[in-house]
Regions:
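C-terminal transmembrane helical hairpin of 12-TM major facilitator-type secondary transporters
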Residues: 258-302
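Paired small-residue
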Residues: 59-66, 74-82, 283-291
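Juxtamembrane intracellular "pre-TM" segments in multi-pass secondary transporters
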Residues: 162-197
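Helix-loop-helix hairpin linking two adjacent transmembrane segments in secondary transporters
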Residues: 75, 104, 112-160, 164
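Helix-breaking motifs and short loop linkers at transmembrane-helix boundaries and internal kinks
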Residues: 16, 48, 69-75, 86, ...
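Conserved MFS/SLC helix-loop-helix module at the cytosolic interface between two early adjacent transmembrane helices
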Residues: 35-74
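A late C-terminal transmembrane helix in Major Facilitator Superfamily
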Residues: 306-342, 349-350
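Cytoplasmic helix-loop-helix junction between adjacent transmembrane helices
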Residues: 79-120
């Protein structure tokens, strides 16, 4: 998704359509990412991680080709939906595999590293996308995504299974998944601690998705940045996300990290609304966004790790719900942001998501089990 952000405005001209419809391609991709995780997560709990990952990558390559050859915006939007569906396999399985292999502090370090790597990828993606888009147009960006899918597919074929059959059988008995035909989703949703941290993760991630939806238009259309300039600035902001994610293990506890990040999100969101209202310059806007994304990284990564720790008995389903709720909510945000003045809607969504994150941190834990409860 990040890779073609710099060319969103130019895609509006290429397809001869509106900004809202081009943003709808972001929305459908996120909806696909959300829905697909609900499919690949439980399947991987039952059949292992390797085969579903291979299947997902084959689907991703095929649907990316569909995006390339789309002749109108509606074909592109539909292909983006299925591309997101396919790409969700890699997203959900990366968390599941980490949870299969690690626990406790080791899981925190590993998931923080994964988030940092994602941040580095986010740094590179818009910069590379801006360069490719400047010389080859938006379709060339999707050709590069297709090539990346082939590389990941090759890696999936060489990957060792992290959830062997004997472990799958033990997990199935422990969660009564087989004997009572209980949905693994119901099992994990009955763990209220898991639900709490999924909500914290989701609403904090909403701030990130708001920035993804609005930044190309604010930076390019309002502040006059070129696609290449936008790519560099966007990549610089992603550095904040990567560094902050990697810094998570330095906190005394995940709860401390969440409190720190949430307070920072609320304060900076208020400052951004004031800056928008007073007609701030570019560098004030950029500085506030940099700090805001750092706070989001700390909060969302800590929420992610904690939720997966509480849902490890059915890690595939837990990862699926985590991703589905997060990306499903994120898929609504571009539509909301495009419904009114982009500065007003961006500021409102920043503050709303930050406030909801803060509200979720106040959900009491004294009656909650410290371990995932099964039916």
């Amino acid at each position: 998704m990040d890779m073609y952000l710099p060319v969103l405005p130019s895609m509006t001209s290429w397809f001869m359509t509106s900004d809202a419809l081009v943003q709808l391609g972001l929305t459908t991709g996120l909806i696909g990412l959300a829905a697909g995780q609900l499919l690949f997560g439980p399947i991987s709990d039952k059949y292992g991680r390797r085969k579903p990952l291979i299947t997902a990558m084959i689907m991703f390559i095929t649907t990316t080709a569909g995006c390339i050859f789309a002749s109108n915006i509606w074909q592109f939007i539909v292909m983006r939906l299925f591309q997101g569906l396919a790409g969700s396999g890699a997203v959900v399985l990366s968390r599941s595999i980490a949870t299969d292999k690690y626990k406790g502090d080791n899981l925190t370090v590993t998931m923080s590293l994964i988030s940092a790597i994602n941040g580095v990828a986010t740094v590179a993606a818009p910069i590379v996308g801006g360069v490719i888009g400047a010389f080859g147009g938006w379709r060339t960006i999707f050709w590069s995504l297709l090539a990346l899918g082939i590389v990941i597919l090759a890696g999936a074929f060489r990957m060792h299974e992290s959830l062997p059959a004997r472990v799958r059988l033990v997990n199935a008995r422990d969660t009564e998944y087989v004997s009572h035909r209980t949905s693994p989703f119901i099992s994990v949703l009955r763990n209220r601690l898991y639900v709490k941290y999924v909500l914290i993760y989701t609403f904090s991630l909403g701030v990130l998705f708001t920035n993804l939806a609005s930044a190309p238009f604010i930076m390019q259309d309002h502040f006059g940045l070129s696609a290449m300039d936008f790519s560099i600035v966007f990549g610089f902001n992603a550095v904040a996300f990567a560094i902050a994610s990697a810094f998570l293990p330095k906190f005394k506890s995940r709860s401390q990290a969440i409190t720190f990040g949430t307070v920072g999100m609320v304060v900076v969101s208020c400052l951004i609304m004031i800056a928008f209202a007073t007609g701030c310059g570019f560098w004030i806007y950029e500085g506030l966004i940099f700090i805001l994304l750092s706070m989001v990284a700390v909060t969302s990564t800590a929420g992610n790790v904690t939720a997966m720790d509480y849902g490890r008995d059915v890690a595939g389903a837990a990862s699926a719900l985590l991703g589905a709720v997060g990306y499903g909510f994120g898929g609504l945000i571009p539509v909301i942001v495009s419904c009114g003045d982009i500065f007003v809607m961006t500021g409102v969504m920043f503050l709303l998501c930050s406030a909801m994150t803060a509200l979720c941190t106040q959900i009491p834990e004294y009656k909650m089990s410290d371990k995932p409860r099964t039916v």
